[in-house]
């Protein structure tokens, strides 16, 4: 690591990335400008991001496919988190690379790391889901989702109801060594999307 550079982690909220693909494409371009501003000021940046709306949409789509096709097994939420890391990372890294090139910065590679985090299988968070995912619903829609799909729904800041899932405390980043290697080599890394994919030993 260049000692002259200040290493910082930027955490982007999933809601700030928009609720649709076009919204996300627009949001990441704005975000990329702010991040590259920091790089030009001499900062070494690592990007993390939320995924609440995105992972919910992916999960809903995969669940709908499973309901329509008896031969299509249900997709675990962990796989949906991995999908969200990949597609958010894809948009972010392309926007960042474009912004870097627009400023004639060609020596900073951008990479997305699919990231897992080790959690305790006995974490009480598994029994008290609290992380909102997916889109907002009315109270009536939320009741249908609970009855029909077994989702746990909660009101979210007076804006409507959303599905909530467990959010266990991360104990260790599984890919931390790989992330360090990339950052130390001068790459702009996007990692730990959605807090990481929770795994147990």
Outline where the language-model segments fall.
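N-terminal glycine-/serine-/threonine-rich phosphate-binding loop
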Residues: 1-48, 57-67, 76, 181-186
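Short, ordered loop/turn segments at secondary-structure junctions
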Residues: 13-15, 51-53, 60, 115-117, ...
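Conserved mixed alpha/beta catalytic, RNA-binding, or beta-rich assembly cores of soluble enzyme
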Residues: 16, 173, 188-201
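Short, basic, glycine/proline-bearing loop/turn elements
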Residues: 16-22, 159-166, 200-201
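Short acidic, glycine/serine/threonine-rich loops at helix termini
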Residues: 20-22, 56-61, 122-128, 200-201
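Ligand-binding beta-strand-loop-alpha-helix segment within the catalytic cores
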Residues: 65-189
């Amino acid at each position: 690591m260049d000692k002259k550079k200040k290493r910082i982690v930027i955490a982007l909220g999933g809601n700030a990335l928009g609720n649709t693909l076009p919204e996300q494409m627009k949001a990441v371009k704005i975000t990329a400008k702010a991040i590259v501003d920091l790089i030009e000021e001499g900062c070494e940046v690592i990007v993390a991001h939320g995924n609440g709306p995105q992972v919910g949409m992916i999960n809903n789509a995969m669940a709908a496919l499973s309901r329509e096709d008896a031969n299509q097994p249900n997709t675990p939420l962990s796989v949906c988190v991995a999908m969200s890391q990949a597609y958010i990372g894809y948009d972010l890294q392309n926007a960042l690379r474009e912004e870097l090139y627009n400023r004639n910065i060609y020596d900073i590679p951008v990479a997305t790391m699919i990231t897992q985090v080790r959690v305790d299988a006995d974490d009480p968070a598994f029994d008290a889901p609290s992380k909102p995912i997916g889109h907002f619903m009315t109270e009536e829609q939320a009741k249908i989702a609970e009855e029909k799909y077994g989702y746990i729904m909660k009101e979210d800041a007076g804006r409507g109801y959303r599905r909530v899932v467990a959010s266990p405390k991360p104990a260790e980043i599984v890919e931390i060594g790989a992330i360090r290697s990339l950052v130390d080599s001068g790459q702009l890394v996007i990692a730990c999307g959605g807090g990481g994919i929770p795994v147990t030993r």
